[in-house]
Structures are given as structure tokens and as C-alpha cells.
Amino acid sequence: MIISQTPLRISFVGGGTDLKDYWSVKPGAVLSTTIDKYVYVIIKERFDDYIYINYTQKEIVNKLSNLKHDLVREAMLKTGIERGVEITTLADIPSEGSGLGSSSSITVGLLNALYAFQGRQVTAEQLAQEACEIEIDILGNPIGKQDQYIAAYGGLREITFNPDETVTVESVKIQNAYKRSFGSNMLLFYTDVTRKSSDILVEQKANTRDKMDILTQMKDQVHLLREILESDDCCDEAGQILYDAWQCKKKLSEKISSPAIDKMYQQACDAGALGGKISGAGGGGFLLVYVPREKQNAVRAAMKDYRDFPFMLDPDGSKIIFNMRRAYWK
């Protein structure tokens, strides 16, 4: 039996510049972190030749091509496993529409577990690259590359997407004391709305060339935020950058926010939040807000109608947490 654990992520700034329509023209960049909420992939060898898949549905098929779960199907094809396995996926949060990158975390976790099932160790770069190939090139999802890379590498990272299709991943060298402060000053509230990111990203992708100036401004915010995080001064300027980033992001598509989300955001700011953003593509999922410690009780009281979702920053990417492997055969 193999179990992989792959973290979910929070994207702070730069989202949208990881779409090919942007980075094929000029380099894109994001600043993201992984958090202590995960997706798990469990792979168990079966005596028979059937394929058993357990998620929100249960599938039992005798041919890989008959699998409806496209991420599992393509990950198995990519890794060369065709039969005789049972695969179960579990998640700490709603598996679709959370805005925390769960689909890409599942893809990365599947690849990691399937390779481990064969006794193979692969790099974070390979996991990220192959997850992008599956989700973007093969399945044609209108998404960017940031989720796959942050899930594979983990930690607090600046990720740059270059026109030559290379990707550069750098650690943000934040002091430990500030890292604790930065992490503890962020609150996450569930909007109680889930949505398919593709519904928003299709429109955003179509508008990319018309929104290049806004996207470039969002990319510049990556460097501003990194500069603040790596400075010696622990300050709350990060909240203002998140506020500015959210104002930019809303200009990319009318679907990114809604009257309900705007009201929720304003409630948090009125109670003391310095800034924030809806996670992922927008439209629902989770609202991230930056709140100084002394204002957090007031913000939680103002947001009492929404579920508070405590989290911590996680320095690790996808990893194998259990490996009891018998001899594998095809």
C-alpha cells in the first residue's frame, strides 16, 4: 500500500499571469504557499486485474479507457500502470471549487503515489511538469501552471513562468519569526459557495490580451510582496498589497466577485482586516484576509456567519507518508 500526502495552496499575488496567454508574451510570476490541508491518494494492489477507484463515486472497470475519473485515468497512463490496483482519493476540504488548488494537488499526488507504487522516486519538477501536461495539454483545462508547481515543491515560493516554457521556482527567504507572524495574521473564511474555476478562467483567458496591463501590475505585486516578506521589518504592508491585488483581480472578469462576496469582504475590512482576496480563480471558495493579531477577535465576531478555517503554512510539497510495497508486476 502507498499513501501520498499533497498540500493545498494559497495564492497571494500574480494569479492569472501563469496562463499561457500571458507568459508566452512576457514572463509571469506568482507568490504562493502550501498549507496544512491536504489531499491523500491511497493505492493498494489488487489480486484481480480490475481497476477500483473510490472518490465521491465508486468505479470498477476492467479497462483503463473505461475510467470516468479523467485525472486518475491520465495519471495511470502517464505512469504505465494499467490494471490490478485500487485507488482512493481523500481531501480535507471540498474537492471541487474551493479555490485552494485541490484538482492539481490530486494530480500531483496521484503521480507521486503511482510512481512510488512502482518503486520509482521522481523529482518535484517532474511531478509538476507531468501534472501540467495532464491537466492542460491532454485534458485541455483552461488553467495555469502555478497549482501544480506549488503542490509539488511546497513552501512559500515565487514561481516564474518564462516564454520559453521553463519554470523557475525560488524559496522566499522569510525570517522564522516573521513567517510565524505572517501566517498567524491570515484568516480563512468559507464563502459556502463552490464553483468550477473553468467557468471563470475561460472568460479570463479570452480577455488576457486585453488585460495585459492589469496582469502586469499583478505580476509586479509579486516582487513587492516578496520584498516586504524578506525585509528585516515585520510590517503589515502585506495586507495592503493583498487589498490592491484583489482590486486588480476583480477587473479581469465580472464573475470573480459577487454582491455576496463584496459584502463579506467589506465586513472583514470594516472590522479590522487590512486586505484580502478570494482564493483561486474567484467566484466562491474561501476568502483570505490579513488581520493584525489585535483585530482578529473583532473580525471573527463580524464574520460569525461564515466558517473560520484555521490553517498553518506548510514547508513541504507532495510526499509519500506510507510505503508498504509488495513486488509490482504488470
Task: Give the role of each language-model region.
Residues M1-S11, D18-S24, V30-S32, D36-I81, ...:
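C-terminal nucleotide
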Residues G284:
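Glycine-rich active-site/cofactor-binding loop and its immediate structural neighborhood
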Residues L100-A124, G155:
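DPxDG-like acidic metal-binding loop motif
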Residues I93-S98, L274:
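Short pre-catalytic strand/loop immediately N-terminal to key active-site residues, enriched for Gly-Thr
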Residues L64, G97-G101:
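Short, conserved acidic/polar surface loops in the N-terminal third of protein domains
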Residues N66, T79-P94:
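Flexible, acidic active-site loops/lids enriched in D/E/S/T/G that coordinate Mg2+ and/or position polar
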Residues E82-T88, R120-L127:
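Short secondary-structure capping/junction motifs at helix and strand boundaries
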